[in-house]
Amino acid sequence: MPESKSSSATPDPHTWVTILAGGSGTRFWPASTPRRPKQLLPLAGDRPLIRETVDRARELVPPERIRILTGAHLLEPFKELLEELPPEAFLVEPRVRGTGPVLAWAAREILRQDPNAVLVSLHADHAIEPLEDFLDLMREGARAASEKDFLFTVAVPPTRPETGYGYIEP
């Protein structure tokens, strides 16, 4: 795991990280396929994107508070690649319904274990730099969400219109 220079305070015992890692590899075809989707490709370095994402998550919370949200077709490749995560870290979608429903389902599952949980939701296929700034922002957001019952959203300014994704209006 890369070393972070971030101010790594003791993680809040109620902060959890969910990682959206479903997808069927259609948007990034032909490099990405249903059998080898983008999150299993080393696009931001020499390691698969899911590995990079889990390492970022481990800078925020211990492995037992990470949940990978995925489809059945990716369960085994993820378990092999992320062997440090416990079996309960992998939440397999009962049905593919999209981002909102899978996050709601994961939140319900986590809140059953920890009624005071604060969720940090990450995407498995994002390259993030600089790491220290990202980690500080995630910690600050989780703290604000916990203390003030806020929803904290991070977005980047778009470089072009993209109908395949949602958007946030200020």
Cite the ranges covered by each PLM segment.
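Conserved N-terminal catalytic core of the sugar/cofactor nucleotidyltransferase
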Residues: 2-19, 26-30, 34, 42-123, ...
